[in-house]
Regions:
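Active-site rim helix/loop that mediates acceptor-substrate recognition in acyltransferases
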Residues: 1-6
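Acyl-donor (CoA/ACP) binding surface of acyl/acetyltransferases
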Residues: 8, 12-147
């Protein structure tokens, strides 16, 4: 089975077409049905709730029974300094599986790197309902899709 290309999911403001942020998955492992995710939001769109909206839509999409490739697990890494990313992943049930000590240099400082995972069964058992409610509460559901 071939490794699928990196897939980008983008949150776009309907009225202007402006890209508010994105989540990607890459390094799909067909033996373990896992992939690494990463997310990015331009500075002007941070701390406005767009990360939660995009993560909810992304997880609902990739853990849907009909979605291919099938994912058993998603995982991510982030620096210990990145409290916004840590908060976002923990809010959506990602588990901190490990720490790589003194791994990430930023502005002359060394930080630990955290590894987070979310299993399909954890999402389906614990998070699916609240994520769907978050999405349905939006007055204007942003356009979301593969780019």
């Amino acid at each position: 089975e071939m490794d699928p290309p990196i897939s980008h999911y983008v949150l776009i403001y309907k009225k202007t077409g402006e890209k508010l942020g994105m989540i990607t998955y890459s390094d799909f492992n067909p033996r373990n049905y896992s992939a690494v995710i990463g997310f990015y939001f331009p500075e002007e769109h941070r701390h406005k709730g767009y990360g939660s909206i995009l993560m909810a839509l992304f997880l609902r999409t990739v853990f849907h029974p009909d979605y291919r490739p099938y994912f058993h697990k998603l995982w991510a890494e982030t620096g210990a300094f990145n409290t916004a990313s840590i908060h976002l992943m923990e809010r959506f049930g990602f588990h901190r599986d490990g720490t790589i000590r003194d791994h990430y240099w930023l502005d002359g400082e060394i930080y630990d790197q955290y590894i987070y995972t979310l299993l399909r069964k954890e999402y389906l058992e614990n998070n699916q309902k609240c994520h769907i409610e978050l999405c349905s509460e939006l007055n204007q559901v942003p356009r979301f899709g593969l780019s």
